[in-house]
């Protein structure tokens, strides 16, 4: 891992780290205020594909988090950027609530497949339509490949198993744009003036949050909330820089040891 420099930026995951659906992680709002009172730059990074950035922001505001839209970098944004770069017409396999983030993108007569978490659309007919497009040479763009995520009623399948099914059936590989891709973390830092070696990532997903960030040159703090399961910290190499109980504990560590 690269030589450490003074901490300048903290990237924070949202779902599972600051909140679970419409409930905040206890103490998270106050911890965020304490972090903001320091000199570090705070940005929020999320793989959520269940809602648009605007809907997500409204949810966070209702939970009394002091967060602005320009501080959030989502995998939906990364997917839209790639679609525009490739100049393709995507079949959008995403939740209807995420569609506003693709406003203005041409989707008729699709020649690409973009897939996120879309429980209402993950049925045979729709997946078979995507399968046929891919067989005809359409690129497969995965917003992310998370295995599962945390809901109020327990763990639930993420888009990863469905992306993998399409890859398997068509003998192709998806281009993944969200966490844990290195480019996602670097894009999140773009315009901040901060380098990965000056950054800490806090999240509840050992692979996508912590492993991805550490592969990009950051330090990763794994929190035991959200989708965390016992011994997750042993699933990645190198191990997390730190594993702690929750976001407030992560902030305590940063304030006491990294500033």
UniProtKB/Swiss-Prot annotation:
GO terms for cellular component: cytoplasm. Mg(2+) binds at residues 13, 15, 204. The modification N6-succinyllysine is found at residue 50. Pfam families: Hydrolase_6, Hydrolase_like. Keywords: Coiled coil, Magnesium, Metal-binding. Residues 47-71 form a coiled coil. SUPFAM superfamilies: HAD-like. Binds 1 Mg(2+) ion per subunit. Its cofactor is Mg(2+). Substrate binds at residues 13-15, 46-47, 179. Belongs to the HAD-like hydrolase superfamily. PANTHER family: 4-NITROPHENYLPHOSPHATASE-RELATED (PTHR19288), HALOACID DEHALOGENASE-LIKE HYDROLASE DOMAIN-CONTAINING PROTEIN 2 (PTHR19288:SF46). The keyword Transport does not apply. InterPro entries: HAD-like_sf (IPR036412), HAD-SF_hydro_IIA (IPR006357), HAD_sf (IPR023214), LHPP/HDHD2 (IPR006355). GO terms for molecular function: enzyme binding; metal ion binding; phosphatase activity. It comes from the Eukaryota. This is Haloacid dehalogenase-like hydrolase domain-containing protein 2.
């Amino acid at each position: 891992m690269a030589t450490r420099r003074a901490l300048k930026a903290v990237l924070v995951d949202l779902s599972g780290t600051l909140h679970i659906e419409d409930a905040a992680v206890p103490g998270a709002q106050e911890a965020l205020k304490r972090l903001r009172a320091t000199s570090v730059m705070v940005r929020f990074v999320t793989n959520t594909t269940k809602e648009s950035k605007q809907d997500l922001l409204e949810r966070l505001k209702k939970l009394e988090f002091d967060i602005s839209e320009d501080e959030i970098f989502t995998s939906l944004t990364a997917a839209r950027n790639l679609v525009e770069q490739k100049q393709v017409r995507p079949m959008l396999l995403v939740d209807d609530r995420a569609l506003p983030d693709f406003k203005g993108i041409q989707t008729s007569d699709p020649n690409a497949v973009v897939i996120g978490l879309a429980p209402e659309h993950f049925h045979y007919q729709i997946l078979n339509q995507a399968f046929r497009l891919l067989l005809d040479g359409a690129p497969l763009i995965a917003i992310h490949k998370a295995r599962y995520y945390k809901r109020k009623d327990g763990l639930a399948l993420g888009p990863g198993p469905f992306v993998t099914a399409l890859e398997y059936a068509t003998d192709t590989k998806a281009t993944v744009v969200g966490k844990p891709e290195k480019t996602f973390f670097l894009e999140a830092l773009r315009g901040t003036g901060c380098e990965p070696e000056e950054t800490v990532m806090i999240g509840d997903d050992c692979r996508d949050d912590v492993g991805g960030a550490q592969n990009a040159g950051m330090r990763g703090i794994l929190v035991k909330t959200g989708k965390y399961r016992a011994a997750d910290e042993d699933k990645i190499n190198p191990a997390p820089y730190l594993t702690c109980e929750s976001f407030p504990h992560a902030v305590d560590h940063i304030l006491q040891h990294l500033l």
